[in-house]
Amino acid sequence: MTILASNNDSANKAKGAEVAKRRLRLSNPWHLLATGFGSGLSPWMPGTVGSLAAIPLWYLMSFLPLELYSLLVMLSICIGVYLCHQTAKDMGVHDHGSIVWDEFVGMWITLMAIPADKWQWVAAGFVVFRCLDIWKPWPIRWFDRNVHGGMGIMID
């Protein structure tokens, strides 16, 4: 009996996630950014796909002076709190897998000091970032469980 309830719970969660995804409108600029220009809509590991999609923008940003790069990252964090909150609210789900703006910004922070021509370091940064994002070591796990809304999405 428990197995059936568990299967039903999984089916209900999957159905709810699909309903939430249908509430997205890529014509809405907040939704477009929150989904990483649509990369978060990947049916296969959207966080990983979103992290990969952040790399071309990082490459362009990597040629900026460090001060301007840092300013763009800080603005992206501030804007991200709002756009992730609004998109999650519109979807009716907190931190839906398709919301990957936090992965974009996290990758930009991870790769900030890496020269654009050091692709082995970019690959290593990607792997470390994804491992930490999936594992969520303390204190990130605490924030993930206790901080809600756009701030919770961005900080995890």
Predicted regions and their residues:
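Hydrophobic alpha-helical transmembrane segments
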Residues: 33, 48-53, 67-74, 100, ...
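Short helix-loop boundary/capping segments at the starts of domains
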Residues: 39, 58, 62-66, 80, ...
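Hydrophobic, well-ordered secondary-structure segments
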Residues: 70-77, 81-90, 116-118, 125, ...
